[in-house]
């Protein structure tokens, strides 16, 4: 009976160790929840969302976004992602996370994620993304 108890304890210990190993996060990453995924939207819906972001900026502050587009550098030095469909075009300014952030090549198709913010330029408030990252 003592041998069976020892075997049972050993098996239980092994099972507990095996179960705990499965709880370890190998890559130490966390999945970021995206509040507004414009990649998943149809072009007309994406255009409408761009319009709404600039008209109702306060509703989108501190929300996370995933936005597709073409990287452009504006004449004032601001970095933008430019979206265009068959009839219309819009752009959103973004600032990459980190002081040594490396921006993509001009006119490269990208997908960026970032947090919605607001800035004032020439007395007008504009929506932009801060802490942005290029994900594709």
Question: PLM features: residue spans?
Answer:
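Bacterial N-terminal signal peptides that target proteins for export
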Residues: 1-10
């Amino acid at each position: 009976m003592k041998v069976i108890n020892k075997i049972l304890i050993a098996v239980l210990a092994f099972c507990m160790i095996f179960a705990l190993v499965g709880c370890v996060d190998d890559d130490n990453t966390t999945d970021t929840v995206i509040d507004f995924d414009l990649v998943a939207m149809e072009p007309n819906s994406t255009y409408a969302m761009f319009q709404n972001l600039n008209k109702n900026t306060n509703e989108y502050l501190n929300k996370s976004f995933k936005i597709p587009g073409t990287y452009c550098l504006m004449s004032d030095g601001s970095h933008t992602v430019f979206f265009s469909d068959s009839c219309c075009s819009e752009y959103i300014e973004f600032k990459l996370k980190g002081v040594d952030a490396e921006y993509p090549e001009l006119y490269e198709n990208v997908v960026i994620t970032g947090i919605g913010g607001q800035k004032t330029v020439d007395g007008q408030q504009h929506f932009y993304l801060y802490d942005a990252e290029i994900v594709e």
